[in-house]
């Protein structure tokens, strides 16, 4: 509907800016480590944000070309990480968590992984609009599924492998206490090569942020017609400024920022996806010919969206009942 979609656009802006801040924090911490901490992580956050902002101004086609090939570099780096860390993996030391703390930690990780992947559903159309209208749907589905599952699995597995080595490598653990960048510098060898790899890995933050800032600008324009009349680069600059503020504020505690933000994404993204899926399956009967594409920006031809708004509201009730965050624990979650 016309009006509920404004809320979705606002939530998407918050989500994309939050993701951009995550990228800036991780990239800034890594950049500080490469500079032997002569550079503040906060300055690193600003540098990453500025590079991302400049790239996002180049337009969608340039972004797509960059994204098409950038993954190769990061894939190679992750494979090197596996090779360097694998000899020191510790899969024998029992966990120190007891009782409900262990399943709670597992569920938190699953929520973070799910939330990071599910957030793609709210921006996919920003990029899939470039596909021909007659593109094979199975091909798009498979590419999307693999494009989410494979990188997420590699990243999560690499993190688990690297974390498990800390029991066997006290020096790496001490470095990790200083920051993720210091840990990577110790894992990668030799020293000069490790600096190069961490700098390249830092660019993965730029890789993510380019899409975040671009999509955030689009979502701002969708919130109201007067906003769509403002050039997109102005909204992109505004997102850039907010990202710097969040990144600088969250750079002191990356893990807490990640858990507090990323675990929230799965809540509203799931509600959004389910509503869209139900409309397509039951109201549109699974046929794209039942959509009036010419009415996408005409409130007189679009439904009011009351049913979708109510469904979304019921979803919010479910979130509040079951969520367990540092700042709030719902009544259902409090039972466990």
Predicted regions and their residues:
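Membrane-water interface regions at transmembrane-helix termini and the short interhelical loops
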Residues: 7, 26-36, 49-70, 85-88, ...
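Transmembrane alpha-helical segments of multi-pass small-molecule transport proteins
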Residues: 9, 35-58, 72-83, 116-124, ...
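Transmembrane helix-loop boundary segments of multi-pass membrane transporters
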Residues: 33-44, 61-70, 185, 189, ...
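Loop-to-transmembrane helix boundary motifs in multi-pass membrane proteins
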Residues: 42-47, 222-256, 297-319
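Membrane-interface loop-to-helix entry segments
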Residues: 43, 47-48, 52-85, 98-100, ...
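Hydrophobic, small-residue-rich membrane helices and short re-entrant helix-turn-helix hairpins
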Residues: 58-71, 119-154, 167-182, 213-233, ...
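Hydrophobic, membrane-embedded alpha-helices of multi-pass small-molecule transporters
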Residues: 82-88, 98-164, 189-213, 301-319
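C-terminal membrane-solvent junction of multi-pass transporters and transport-like membrane proteins
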Residues: 272-336
């Amino acid at each position: 509907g016309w009006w509920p979609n404004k809320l979705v656009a606002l939530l998407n802006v918050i989500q994309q800016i939050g993701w951009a801040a995550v990228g800036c924090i991780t990239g800034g911490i890594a950049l500080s480590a490469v500079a032997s901490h002569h550079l503040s992580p906060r300055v690193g956050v600003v540098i990453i944000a500025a590079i991302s902002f400049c790239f996002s101004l180049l337009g969608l086609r340039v972004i797509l070309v960059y994204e098409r090939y950038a993954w190769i570099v990061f894939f190679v780096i992750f494979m090197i990480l596996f090779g360097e860390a694998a000899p020191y993996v510790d899969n024998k030391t029992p966990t120190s968590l007891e009782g409900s703390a262990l399943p709670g930690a597992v569920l938190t990780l699953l929520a973070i992984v799910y939330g990071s992947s599910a957030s793609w559903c709210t921006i996919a159309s920003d990029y899939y609009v470039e596909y021909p209208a007659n593109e094979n749907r199975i091909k798009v589905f498979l590419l999307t599924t693999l494009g989410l599952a494979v990188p997420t699995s590699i990243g999560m597995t690499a993190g688990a492998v690297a974390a498990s080595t800390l029991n066997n490598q006290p020096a790496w653990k001490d470095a990790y206490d200083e920051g993720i960048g210091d840990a990577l510098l110790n894992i990668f060898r030799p020293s000069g090569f490790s600096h190069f790899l961490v700098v390249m890995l830092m660019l993965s933050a730029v890789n993510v942020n380019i899409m975040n800032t671009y999509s955030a600008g689009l979502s701002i324009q969708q919130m109201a017609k007067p906003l769509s009349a403002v050039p997109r680069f102005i909204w992109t600059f505004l997102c850039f400024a907010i990202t710097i503020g969040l990144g600088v504020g969250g750079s002191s505690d990356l893990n807490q920022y990640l858990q507090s933000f990323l675990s929230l994404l799965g809540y509203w993204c799931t509600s959004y996806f389910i509503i869209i899926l139900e409309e397509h399956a039951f109201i549109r009967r699974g046929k794209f010919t039942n959509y009036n594409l010419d009415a996408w920006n005409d409130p007189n031809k679009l439904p009011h969206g009351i049913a979708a708004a109510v469904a979304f509201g019921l979803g919010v009730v479910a979130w509040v009942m079951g969520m367990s965050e540092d700042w709030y624990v719902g009544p259902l979650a409090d039972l466990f």
